[in-house]
Amino acid sequence: MKIYYVYIVKCSDNSYYTGFTNDLERRINEHNDGLNSESYTYTRKPVELVFYHEFNDVNQAIRFEKQVKGWSKKKKEAIINDNWDLLQLLSKNRMKD
């Protein structure tokens, strides 16, 4: 069974990048190696993996990645810190950064 990952990395400028992959270690190395000069993380190296979630279904992973990409920085930090209560509160109140 194939496993897919949605991940968040913290960049050197303290911003976050959310991505999707089927090989987490390879993808994080690619971000840090800076192979694509047009990538968001290219000028923000090094990056640090701060969150990931595994999926067995590729479509669920893609939906979750799109959802997280639309979140505020505060929501991303809530999930990174495993603070589901805060995430729920931020979602309910639609608080912005």
Question: Which residues fall in each region the model found?
Answer:
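GIY-YIG nuclease catalytic motif and its immediate N-terminal context
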Residues: 1-36, 42-52, 56, 63-66, ...
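Short arginine-rich
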Residues: 67-79
